[in-house]
């Protein structure tokens, strides 16, 4: 067969649009650019920000979005309380998520004037996830969307500090505090219905509460979901959570699902969790489309602001997160990078430790191999008759036998081996079984036991140093 085509590996982002936005809720929309997302979802909306974060890493990949209605609940608020009059002219640098907002301050400005300047500067940037109001020296930021997701939009002052040229004007103090916590989570059943049977290899989910994740767990499951024999759509869900070590461990322990990657980030991370989820989805898409078996480690999350030095997880803490099914990231030279994309799967049905689905690359490799097999069989034997081995049919007959299919699968395995997807051909050949079903004469049963290549993650060295070798050099 001449077929060498591959699936496009489309991505999907789920999130909120602004009230009154052009996009229709719970409908699948092709999203070519961040500009188009702002146009139809609304500037500052969750979806617009997620698309922007996604496109910073994957500018060319096929991307769809689904806008979901807001939760029934409360919108998160953050307060900035100004104290002290300015004794010099300067600038207040407020970071709302990844965006720096600069508010001018003039020598002699009082708290009310400074707060008003901050409010005006924030409201002048429509792409922000908050709107601002001020009164008596207090600036109140209110999330554009109701729900828990507003609690994971960081606000801080002077992210880069003195070394980065960011300091408060003399005489001015500003305290940043959490106001009203956002409450409520959206109902995702409409979004799942909108997905229908469209294939999405990479799904970015901004909602990390247990019920929301479990809705996607059901959609992805192996029995009746996207990974079932009946649907064969496959795909993987990426979500993110910002929190303390204990909060993230608790979150990871809520799940035991191989089709979900929950990435954990430090409390002081200066990027909203929804944008982190979108960025990690994009990074996986770019890497996995190119090679599903190659590890995503070191992948740059472009434009994402990490926690500052001294506020990042230690290696021991990162290992703890991984042990509880939470994917990790690290920072090198100020750049946030993927450390390991584990899934939340840790135990089998008996509660015994199981690393079969530890790494998301294993699942992506499985999807790649299964699609390859389907492509080979349907392209070459789409309208063939089935006969037993040894049948003496004439030349030109479109007939296939178990031995023919077995030979085809062995040839395909060699192709996968050359592509660096599988290994151990001889053992695979030994264990491969293709036989005609005893009850259904139109069916071939195949036991296909691939040995996937793995990822280099640990390089162990015993450094047995010597001050001087006593033997003469050879």
PLM feature spans:
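Extended, beta-strand-rich, solvent-exposed assembly scaffolds of outer structural proteins
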Residues: 33-41, 84-154, 203, 222
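Extended Gly/Ser/Thr-rich low-complexity repeat segments
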Residues: 95, 148-165, 462-464
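Structural signature of extracellular appendage/secretion-system components
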Residues: 1-87, 91-100, 105, 143, ...
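A glycine-rich, acidic short-motif signal
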Residues: 41-57, 67-69, 163-169, 173-303
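Structured, hydrophobic secondary-structure cores that serve as assembly/anchoring elements
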Residues: 1-62, 297-320, 324-474
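Short, exposed beta-strand/loop patches in secreted or surface proteins that constitute
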Residues: 93-94, 129-134, 160-174
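Generic alpha-helical secondary structure
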Residues: 111-115, 119, 213, 398, ...
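Generic recognition of long tandem-repeat/solenoid scaffolds
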Residues: 78-82, 138-143, 336-340, 444-448
């Amino acid at each position: 067969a001449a077929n060498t085509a591959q699936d496009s590996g489309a991505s999907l982002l789920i999130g909120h649009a602004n009230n009154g936005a052009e996009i229709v809720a719970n409908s699948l929309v092709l999203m070519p650019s961040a500009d188009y997302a702002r146009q139809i979802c609304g500037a500052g909306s969750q979806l617009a920000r997620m698309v922007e974060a996604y496109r910073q890493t994957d500018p060319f990949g096929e991307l769809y979005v689904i806008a979901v209605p807001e939760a029934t609940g409360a919108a998160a608020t953050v307060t900035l309380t100004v104290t002290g009059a300015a004794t010099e002219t300067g600038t207040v640098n407020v970071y709302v998520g990844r965006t720096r907002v600069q508010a001018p301050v003039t020598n002699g400005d009082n708290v009310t004037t400074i707060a008003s300047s901050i409010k005006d500067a924030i409201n002048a940037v429509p792409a922000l996830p908050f709107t601002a109001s001020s009164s008596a020296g207090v600036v109140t930021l209110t999330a554009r969307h109701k729900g828990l997701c507003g609690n994971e939009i960081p606000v801080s002052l002077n992210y880069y500090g003195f070394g980065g040229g960011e300091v408060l004007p003399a005489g001015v103090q500003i305290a940043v505090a959490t106001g009203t916590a956002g409450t409520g989570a959206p109902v995702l059943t409409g979004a799942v219905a909108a997905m229908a049977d469209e294939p999405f290899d990479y799904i970015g989910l901004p909602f990390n509460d247990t019920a929301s994740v479990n809705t996607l767990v059901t959609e992805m499951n192996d029995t009746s979901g996207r990974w079932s024999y009946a649907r064969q759509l496959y795909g993987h869900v990426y979500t993110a959570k910002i929190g303390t070590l204990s909060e993230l461990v608790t979150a990871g322990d809520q799940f035991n699902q191989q089709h979900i990657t929950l990435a954990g980030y430090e409390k002081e991370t200066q990027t909203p969790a929804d944008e982190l989820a979108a960025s990690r989805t994009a990074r996986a898409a770019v890497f996995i489309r190119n090679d599903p078996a190659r590890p995503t480690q070191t992948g740059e999350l472009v434009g994402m602001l990490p926690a500052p030095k001294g506020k990042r997880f230690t290696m021991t803490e990162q290992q703890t997160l991984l042990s509880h099914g939470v994917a990790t990231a690290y920072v090198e030279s100020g750049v946030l990078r993927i450390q390991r994309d584990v899934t939340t799967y840790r135990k089998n049905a008996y509660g015994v430790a199981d690393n079969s689905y530890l790494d998301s690359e294993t699942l992506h490799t499985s999807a790649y191999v299964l699609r390859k097999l389907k492509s080979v069989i349907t392209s070459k034997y789409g309208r063939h008759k089935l006969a037993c081995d040894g049948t003496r049919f004439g030349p030109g007959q479109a007939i296939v036998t178990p031995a023919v299919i077995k030979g085809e699968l062995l040839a395909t395995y060699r192709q996968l081996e050359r592509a660096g997807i599988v290994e151990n051909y001889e053992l695979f050949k030994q264990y491969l079984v293709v036989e005609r079903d005893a009850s259904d004469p139109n069916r071939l049963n195949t036991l296909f036991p691939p040995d996937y290549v793995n990822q280099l993650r640990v390089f162990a060295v015993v450094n047995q140093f010597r001050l001087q070798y006593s033997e003469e050099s050879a």
